[in-house]
Amino acid sequence: MAAETLTELEAAIETVVSTFFTFAGREGRKGSLNINEFKELATQQLPHLLKDVGSLDEKMKTLDVNQDSELRFSEYWRLIGELAKEVRKEKALGIRKK
């Protein structure tokens, strides 16, 4: 990207992508999250949004569309979409302030 200052939304997208690549490939294939990398990302970066999800193993299985026991970026993006929908619902109901 250019050296220009990013907007708040652009910075948020940059963070979502960078976070994936920070955790992806630490143990398994580069560019995808294995179960341990997914759990580490979830517990470190999404502890509040995933607190009621139940088993992270089960959540990974539902996200892992091609059933290869790893999450590619497109599968990870499904999680981000699901979480964004929940945040939107909470905001619409006045539950979430920020």
Swiss-Prot record:
What is the predominant subcellular site recorded for this chain? cytoplasm
**Coiled coil regions, renumbered to chain:** none
For the EF-hand domain, which residue ranges apply?
18-53
Task: Identify the residues that bind Ca(2+) 1.
Answer: 32, 37
Q: Name one GO molecular function term.
A: copper ion binding
Q: Establish whether keyword Protein transport is in the entry.
A: yes
State where Ca(2+) 2 binds: 64, 66, 68, 70, 75
Gene3D superfamilies in alphabetical order: EF-hand
Species of the source:
Mus musculus (Mouse)
| Protein name in UniProt | Protein S100-A13
For this protein, the record's Pfam families field holds:
S_100
Q: Which UniProt keywords apply?
A: Calcium, Copper, Cytoplasm, Lipid-binding, Metal-binding, Phosphoprotein, Protein transport, Repeat, Secreted, Transport
Name the domain of life.
Eukaryota
Give the GO terms filed under biological process for this record.
positive regulation of cytokine production; positive regulation of interleukin-1 alpha production; protein transport
UniProt keyword annotation of Endoplasmic reticulum present: no
Q: Tell me, what does this protein do in biology?
A: Plays a role in the export of proteins that lack a signal peptide and are secreted by an alternative pathway. Binds two calcium ions per subunit. Binds one copper ion. Binding of one copper ion does not interfere with calcium binding. Required for the copper-dependent stress-induced export of IL1A and FGF1. The calcium-free protein binds to lipid vesicles containing phosphatidylserine, but not to vesicles containing phosphatidylcholine.
